[in-house]
Regions:
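Sec-dependent bacterial lipoprotein signal peptides
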Residues: 1-15
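Residues in flexible loops and secondary-structure boundaries
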Residues: 9-12, 22-25, 117, 140
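Generic cytosolic/nucleocytoplasmic N-terminal low-complexity/intrinsically disordered segments
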Residues: 1-2, 22-23, 27, 88
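Bacterial lipoprotein signal-peptidase II cleavage site
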Residues: 15-32
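Mature extracytoplasmic or organellar-lumen-exposed domains after removal of signal/transit peptides
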Residues: 31-229
Length: 229
């Protein structure tokens, strides 16, 4: 995982050079300003476009699965609800490298209790996956989850609409992936994410898969610059 993070960081620096070059256009053809070739820029643009499609697909799947989760909760099947909870979340966790661009939707869908209370000084208004998680594991029942499940579905629908307008850049993808892998290695590994269900390993796997998707998209450009990476 460390090697993956280092590799992604190297491409992030390359993408940063591209952004810097575009902001420092000069008429002097001999300028020392670093910039990408048209071919490399096209590769970056293609990778960015494909990744956005990937995220849209993940959020589509998240919505479908969460609607089914809502039905399971409504039926009162506690065992099934606990079984599918971590599996459903994986689609969201694969998209987390660009969660920064989700804005308030990320807060509504994936905010942990400790973070919510830290910002709002109370639990009032707290919702999302982790609100349902606490009821399922701490109270060991599906009762009381229905309203949160309905709100969660609506919040994911809102996110789905938002994704279509989000500007995804190579810098956002790459720095987001590196930051996420670092978070997994230094913070999430303690179990802080799924504090009630202890299903963190599913999150780790999905986070790494999301970062690997970014790596795969940029791999041709990485190998072109340094085949040893």
């Amino acid at each position: 995982m460390k090697k993956l993070a280092v590799t992604l960081l190297s491409v992030a620096l390359l993408a940063g050079c591209a952004n810097t070059a575009s902001k420092n256009t000069t008429t002097n053809s001999s300028s020392s300003t670093v910039k990408l070739s048209k071919e490399d820029q096209k590769a970056l643009d293609q990778a960015t476009s494909e990744y956005k499609e990937f995220v849209q697909g993940q959020i589509d799947q998240l919505l479908k699965d969460t609607e089914e989760f809502q039905r399971v909760l409504k039926s009162g099947d506690l065992e099934e609800a606990k079984k599918v909870y971590p599996l459903i979340r994986m689609s969201y966790e694969r998209s987390e490298p660009i969660a920064e661009s989700f804005g308030e939707s990320d807060v509504k869908i994936d905010f942990r209790l400790v973070d919510y209370v830290d910002e709002n000084k109370s639990e009032e208004g707290w919702s999302g996956f982790h609100r349902i998680e606490r009821i399922l594991w701490e109270q060991n029942t599906t009762e009381g989850t229905e309203k949160y499940a309905e709100q969660l579905v609506n919040d994911i629908k809102e996110l789905k609409a938002k994704i279509a307008t989000v500007e995804v850049t190579p810098d956002l993808m790459l720095t987001g992936a590196v930051d996420l892998l670092n978070e997994v290695a230094t913070q999430k590994i303690t179990g802080e994410e799924e504090i009630f269900s202890h299903t963190d390993l599913y999150d780790f796997r999905a986070n790494i898969e999301g970062a690997e998707k970014i790596f795969a998209l940029f791999k041709p450009l990485i190998e072109k610059k340094d085949a040893k990476l």
